[in-house]
Amino acid sequence: MFIINVKSNSTILNDILKLEKRSSIKLNSFEKILLMNNGTTELFLQILSNSLTKLVIIQQIEKNNIITRKINIITKDRGKILAEAQSIIYLKNLPNKIKDEIRKGEKGIGMIILENKLETYKRITEIGYNSKESYIYRKYKLLSGKHIISKVIENFKGDMIK
């Protein structure tokens, strides 16, 4: 496992280059963009895969005003897994309408936030490469104002976007 702690979203290209050097891999442009993308992952994957996507909830548990969930983002036409994600969602920091939509489990948090026009900032905290299972990943915090609304880990296997 090769891990790079990201100090700032503005220096992430240097961090990606460090990851390539330490792990002896060469990422293609799509993989680099996946690691640094600070927009909605689901929309970005739709463009990369040239396919509409849907969210598959593997597990979703709500306890003490926190939702933990595991999801896959898959292509609607082929059912191909594009990304696997684990998230912790802090409901106390979200409006009721957004909480209700998250509980339904039909859309990713990024799409829900986009549709509800909630101002957020994605702070990428770590990127890495798992050499045993051959996937790149990133960790980030989703913030609204000074409040953390979610912590997310997204995994992208090499064949997910090809």
What role is predicted for each listed range?
Residues M1-K162:
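Composition-driven recognition of glycine/serine/threonine/acidic- and proline-rich low-complexity segments
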